[in-house]
Regions:
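Catalytic histidine-centered segment of alpha/beta-hydrolase-like enzymes
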Residues: 293-302, 306
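A short, Lys/Arg-enriched amphipathic alpha-helix followed by its capping loop at the start of a domain
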Residues: 75-83, 120
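Serine-hydrolase catalytic-loop signature spanning alpha/beta hydrolases and amidase-signature enzymes
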Residues: 66-74, 85
Length: 319
């Protein structure tokens, strides 16, 4: 990591967070059998499944690729002591509807799915949490519907400006994004589409370390649509890079407080994309970089992520 990019990070936040993380341990009780399940109806009648735990101000959590609502199990268990924590299955995954056609995975519709869940739960505003593609959706929800997003938490997904900048100018990020080109160009039936392997429930869940959790992932991916998973890339991910990537209008500044985590061993999204994030925000940024954690930082560093979320939200949500 190029540490010179991060001189402006709010170090005082880390001074407060790290002692807390050392003391706190994420609850060990699994949430799989404790959550209640429901569905919100989005545009076109698409049903979005969610798992809910706890009561209080609403927190909506959005997974990425390849994943499902259960990725947030550690955070849900802890945050549910003060919040209603709702983790969705994005369209195409697990128990949510899986409409055919790449056009049905446009970012506008993915944002609409989040809004449908918030409205279904009769809330005006929520803390929105997103990882990977869920981070893309979370950023865009904050931009398109700022009145609905009270606070924003992003895991391993740079601000859109930072990601586009790196795709234009950073050879490492351009190389790291070759997998996305593969997803855009190949069908899910190609035997090499998934990092040289076929897409199966087993290969897609190979990154999950805990054997009990992995079995649940295999089951969830067995219910998912692999073509839908790739449609996120085919519809929304830039098809060009380097000098060929066209300029895009700069979006407005993010209007709410932001907490970001980034596992520094991420092989897909370079940490250089974080540099300058504060220039694109109106309010405070707390940035937590996590050495030793990879792309799935919410699981690789579950205790740190969970305790930091608790601390950060406690500072901003009245009791």
């Amino acid at each position: 990591m190029r540490t010179s990019h991060f001189a402006a990070v709010v170090l005082s936040a880390l001074v407060l967070v790290l002692p807390l993380a050392a003391r706190a341990q994420a609850p060990q009780a699994d949430v799989f059998d404790r959550v209640t399940h429901g569905y919100a109806v989005s545009e076109g009648g698409v049903k979005i499944h969610y798992a809910s735990l706890g009561k209080g101000p609403l927190v909506v959590m959005i997974h990425g690729f390849p994943d499902f609502w259960y990725t947030w199990r550690h955070q849900m268990a802890a945050l549910s002591e003060r919040f209603q924590v709702v983790a969705i299955d994005q369209r195409g995954y697990n128990l949510s509807d899986q409409p055919k056609g790449v056009e049905n995975y446009d970012l506008r519709l993915l944002v609409g799915d989040v809004a449908a869940v918030v409205r279904h739960l009769k809330a005006d505003r929520a803390t929105i949490v997103g990882h990977d593609w869920g981070g893309v959706v979370a950023w865009q929800t904050a931009l398109a519907m700022p009145q609905m997003v009270e606070r924003l938490i992003i895991l391993n997904l740079p601000h859109p400006n930072g990601l586009l900048r790196e795709l234009r100018s950073n050879p490492e990020q351009i190389k790291n994004s070759e997998y996305a080109r593969n997803f855009q160009q190949k069908p899910p039936t190609d035997p090499t589409v998934f990092f040289g392997m076929p897409m199966t429930p087993q290969t897609l869940s190979g990154w999950v370390r805990d054997p009990v959790a992995r079995a649940r992932y295999v089951e969830a991916f067995g219910k998912s649509d692999f073509e839908a998973m790739l449609n996120y890339y085919k519809r929304n991910y830039p098809r060009a890079s380097g000098a060929d990537l066209p300029a895009t209008p700069e979006p407005p500044k993010i209007a709410m407080p932001v907490l970001m985590f980034h596992g520094l061993n991420d092989q897909a999204l370079h940490s250089d994309g974080l540099s300058g994030t504060w220039k694109w925000l109106e309010k405070d940024l707390t940035l937590v970089t996590v050495p030793g954690a990879g792309h799935f930082v919410q699981q690789d560093a579950a205790d740190l992520v969970t305790s930091t979320m608790q601390w950060w939200l406690a500072m901003r949500v009245p009791k």
